[in-house]
Amino acid sequence: MALFIVTVSELTDYIAEKFEKDDWLNQVAVEGELSNCKFSQGHLYFTLKDERAELKGVMYKGRASALPFIPQDGQKVIVFGQVAVYKKRGIYQIYAEMIEPLGIGALYLKFEQTKEKLRDKGYFAEERKKKLPRYPEKIGIVTSKNGAAIRDILTTIKKRWPKATLYLVPVAVQGDEAPGQIVKALNLLNRYKLCEVIILARGGGSFEELAAFNEETVADAIYASNIPVVTGIGHETDTSIADMVADRRAPTPTGAAVEATPNLVEIWNNLREQRQKMVKALANYFQREQKNLEFQERRILRAYEKLITDKSREVTEGLERLLRSFKTTFQQEKNRLSLLKEKLILLSPYLRHKQQKEKLEELKERLFLRCAELLKRNQAVLIQQSLRLRTSVKNLVLQKNLVLSSYEERLKLLNPLKILNRGYAVVFDFEGRVVTSVNNLPERFKIKFSDGEALAKALGKNIIEGDKNDDL
């Protein structure tokens, strides 16, 4: 057999043509373990191997960017594609069109990789999550317009918080279009600030059916939302990436509605309890103020009595001093008169006697005039002190009366029964509880007026319709 001499290129072209004409090699699925994985200019280069052989492989940028997971060394995969010759190096390799992981599956692998990526970015951090509004008036709902989820949410909100205005943005909750619709719905509610809290929910399903809520784009939209997001996705055992990013996570759609709303019945009960506490506190305050007023009254009376006692003592002491002064002066003049009398007796002559007698009469008259003048002056001082005492006592009594009047006015203002003087009345049941609604009116009841109570019997009820939420 004659041998033909060919060039390397000719031989390589010949072999490449054989590969191209082999239908099986043009569409092959190869199972193996990835190694030497690397990206270069967007292209993925890898080696696929098993226990006995290795196969070079490449996936071009357009297909590599669409992979639902990141290929890594050691992963067991199935590579779908075409086996052909790489003429420049004279080797054959597989040109991959699709790569699927074995074992945990592509969706779960993508889930784990996305979760790790978002955790590193801080999407799950508790400190960045927003607080839910306590009494939301507007609630956005992002879910399917059909199915049990929306029915459960509407039923729960109607029961717990019927005053809220609801904005439903219907979306697909599974399938290829679901992530995009969910993102648009969240962005719409944020752009126009339509609500104060958003419920993102769907009913239970398989891991594949919940895949839309594991998409990174949905997580980005939740993270970027300025409005708090509450999720209720699947059943209690299901946890999606959307749940991890959300500001509050509930196990079911019903649970999400509970998390997003307060309980109106509980609020009414709390208000009723607070009102009872306020009435009790007001009664206690009134009682304390009344005791304080009585104490102030006793204190003022004691101060008034003490002032009277002190002033009386001062007057008595002044009178005693005046009397002692008068007695001293009178005694001094009396002693002087006695001395003169003794001198007169000693002189004895008639003329001297007459002169001394006249002088004695003059001195006697001067003595009485001086005593009268002294008595009059001291009497004026006594009257002046008495007037000052009376004025001081009068001013003190007036001042204390003003204080008492001020406390009396404050007590009147604090008296909860004062309103009854203007024609109002309070209805009690026979247990002493205030009846605040016609719906709670018993058949027999008591009516309290400003001057007494009356027993009454209900002959009928007339309910006046109005805004039930006015008290909120």
From Swiss-Prot:
Keywords: Cytoplasm, Exonuclease, Hydrolase, Nuclease. It catalyses: Exonucleolytic cleavage in either 5'- to 3'- or 3'- to 5'-direction to yield nucleoside 5'-phosphates. The keyword rRNA-binding does not apply. One of its GO terms (molecular function) is nucleic acid binding. It is found in: Cytoplasm. One of its GO terms (cellular component) is cytoplasm. Its EC number is 3.1.11.6. GO terms for biological process: DNA catabolic process. Its main location: cytoplasm. It comes from the Bacteria. InterPro entries: Exonuc_VII_L, Exonuc_VII_lsu_C, OB-fold_nuc-bd_dom. Pfam families: Exonuc_VII_L, tRNA_anti_2. Bidirectionally degrades single-stranded DNA into large acid-insoluble oligonucleotides, which are then degraded further into small acid-soluble oligonucleotides. Belongs to the XseA family. Heterooligomer composed of large and small subunits. This is Exodeoxyribonuclease 7 large subunit. The lineage of its organism: Bacteria, Bacillati, Bacillota, Clostridia, Thermoanaerobacterales. The gene is xseA.
